[in-house]
Regions:
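Histidine- and acidic-residue-rich, metal-dependent catalytic cores
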Residues: 2-424
Length: 424
């Protein structure tokens, strides 16, 4: 089966902002933390006379510096004090995620060390001076944002002069130990500038970045395989929110690609379906962990919250993948042929083959995977439930029959027992 050939591209500028938005959803009381750290780091870099390219890299690092954080419990550690006790886990995780993502691997080393004390970082011999400076700047910028958010604002929502002095005092007290001294000096100068504080708002920060978009990420737009690398990063961030949904996106992606091959789709369409599987649940980053982990039946309000993840997915994907078929294939995974699905209530004539394939694949994988309220189902039970949904006119019969005909390998892919599908 063929679809119009398209060169799938992902906008790396928007990817970095979507990572920041995704991390806001993990549990920060103060949203736009990534935006503010990016802005603080960039502003300080420019004051120090860094090159525009290096300052732009600092901005990008600020947006994604906490990409290794997935649960509220990890955030709680970072937000308990000026000097948090445990930071290595999310730094290492962020490093691993970025190192494996070719379009973003330039950011891996600075993220690995972005909570490392300057005394220790300055002695490391296998890290470039630029990466050391970037790590040190992100560390300092992150702690500036912690300090300004941890103290009360004035009655109009502005940082008080007293708090500016307090922040500068804390930074100076730790210069040469926690923080790189010359960066502390420049940061303290910056803290006295009213415009610096007044411009620290999400809309101003995004407008600022649009002025240097062409050096923000290199290349700005990437092709299908690079898009898949980015999608794999997002899938790991999404799946890590819950041990019960861990690897769900990855397994859906692999199974969708395998079934597409069996159904005669072109190699490019198969890869696009793999991409769609990876990103279909990206909207779940905004779903509270308490709902994802709930072992009991959901209330109406909680179910409504679950349902909105499909819409949140669509909006995020529209920002990153402009006018791509992949957006619909991923975002339609809870639509049903009889119109009973969500969030749009689409019917059969509005759902193309790939959208139907992802929907069936998502249900099959979810049934075979353990969830808070039940253990993973057997292959026989899973097929029985799927067949009932097909008979009721909700799911596509052709995709179901393909799964049924290749049931053993589909079950192994779905449960993670076989990551490499047999040749189509």
């Amino acid at each position: 089966m063929e679809f119009p050939k398209e060169d799938v591209c992902v906008d790396m500028h928007r990817v970095l902002f979507e990572i920041a938005y995704a991390l806001d959803a993990v549990g920060y009381d103060e949203i736009y933390h990534g935006h503010r750290v990016a802005y603080i780091a960039y502003s300080c870099a420019m004051r120090m006379g860094w090159s525009e390219e290096k300052a732009h890299k600092a901005f990008a690092l600020g947006l994604i510096h906490d990409c290794g954080v997935s649960e509220n419990s990890e955030l709680d550690v970072l937000l308990t004090s000026f000097i948090p006790k445990e930071t290595k886990r999310h730094c290492i995780k962020g490093y691993e995620l970025l190192k494996a993502c070719e379009p973003l691997n330039q950011f891996a080393i600075p993220i690995l060390y972005h909570h490392t004390d300057w005394r220790q970082l300055s002695e490391i011999t296998n890290v470039s001076d630029d990466d050391k400076q970037l790590s040190a700047l992100i560390f300092l910028s992150d702690r500036v944002d912690y300090l300004q958010c941890s103290r009360p604002y004035d009655s109009y929502g502005n940082v008080t002069s007293e708090n500016k002095r307090y922040i500068a005092k804390e930074l100076s007290a730790n210069a040469g130990t926690m923080f790189e001294p010359s960066i502390v000096e420049s940061m303290n100068e910056l803290l006295t500038c009213d415009d610096f504080w007044f411009s620290m708002e999400q809309r101003h920060i995004e407008n600022l970045s649009s002025q240097f978009v062409h050096t923000f990420a290199n290349p700005l737009q990437t092709g299908l395989e690079e898009s898949i690398c980015v999608a794999e990063l997002f899938a790991q961030i999404v799946d890590a929110k819950s041990s019960f949904t861990y690897q769900h996106s990855n397994h859906v992606a692999r199974l969708a690609e395998y079934l597409a091959g069996k159904l005669g789709y072109s190699p490019q369409t198969c890869r696009m379906l793999y991409l769609a599987g990876l990103i279909h649940d990206i909207g779940k980053l905004k779903t509270p962990s308490s709902i994802l982990h709930k072992p009991d039946q959901l209330t109406d309000d909680e179910y409504c919250c679950i349902k909105r993840h499909a819409t949140d997915s669509r909006h995020a994907l529209e920002n990153m993948f402009k006018d791509s078929l992949v957006i619909d294939w991923a975002a339609n995974h809870h639509e049903r042929l009889d119109g009973s699905g969500y969030p749009l209530g689409l019917r059969a004539k509005q759902l193309d083959g790939p959208s139907r394939l992802v929907a069936v694949t998502d249900v099959f994988q979810a049934l075979t995977q353990s969830r808070p309220y039940r253990a993973g189902l057997s292959l026989e039970k899973t097929l029985s439930i799927l067949e009932e949904l097909v008979d009721d006119g909700k799911l596509d019969r052709q995709v179901f029959e393909c799964i049924s005909a290749n049931r053993e390998i589909c079950y192994r892919i779905s449960t993670g027992r076989e990551y490499l599908a047999e040749p189509a």
